[in-house]
Amino acid sequence: MTIANWPACERPREKLMESGAAALSDAELLAILLRVGAAGKSAVDLARELLHRFGSLTALFAAEGRALTSVRGMGETKYAQLQAIPELARRALAESLRLPTGFDGPAAVRNYLRLTLAPLPHEVFLCLFLDPRNRMVASEEMFRGTLTRTAVYPREVARQALVHNAAGIIVAHNHPRGTTAPSQSDIRLTHELARTLDLIDVRLLDHFIVAGQEIRSLADCCDRLPGL
């Protein structure tokens, strides 16, 4: 039975219009995006198959094109649609960090960092450069490493802070396939960054570690960081 033949209260689009997006399951929301399924399976069936195969929304949105288009009912158009969703979310969150009021808490920053770093298979060191009102003026990937290691140079971070005339910086890196537990080298790097930035009167506000959907603030274990 196609979705068009379902009772109106069970159709994802009608259900969303009636009760709001929060009332829908992951598969139902994904089905609205996919629009159609394939011969013998509805868009909801296809959405459930994708979630089962990839295990989570995060893994699905991070999947390579070849893996996605190998699923019957998926093609380049649907792959492009799936790629657009997290990118739009990242851009919307980045916009919110540039609002005149700046950010009034860590939630938006954490969400932005999750969306940016969680899907990556390699380690990346990211810097958010802030103006005196805590508005983000730039987000830059400063260093990129292998699965387990990235070389970070505090002087390069300080140089970019001067380029952006930043008053403060938030840094973050991911632990692909790891945990958010900071290593001793993570803590040493944080102290070294804070000392280097102090020399040019720039505050290091926080250092976050992202692993999957988990995120940890090093302000909790580093007394040099004021936190957000």
UniProtKB/Swiss-Prot annotation:
Gene3D superfamilies, per database record:
5' to 3' exonuclease, C-terminal subdomain, Cytidine Deaminase, domain 2
Which GO MF terms are attached to this record? metal ion binding; metallopeptidase activity
Q: Keyword annotations for this protein? A: Hydrolase, Metal-binding, Metalloprotease, Protease, Zinc
Describe the location of the MPN domain by residue ranges: 102-224
Per the annotation, the residue ranges of the short sequence motif JAMM motif are: 173-186
Q: In its keyword annotation, does this UniProt entry include Translocase?
A: no
The family database entries (Pfam families) matched by this protein are listed as: RadC (PF04002), UPF0758_N (PF20582)
What SUPFAM superfamilies does this protein's entry cite? Answer: RuvA domain 2-like
Q: Name one GO biological process term.
A: proteolysis
Q: Where does Zn(2+) bind?
A: H173, H175, D186
Membership in a protein family: Belongs to the UPF0758 family.
Q: What is this protein called?
A: UPF0758 protein H16_A3033
Q: What is the lineage of its organism?
A: Bacteria, Pseudomonadati, Pseudomonadota, Betaproteobacteria, Burkholderiales
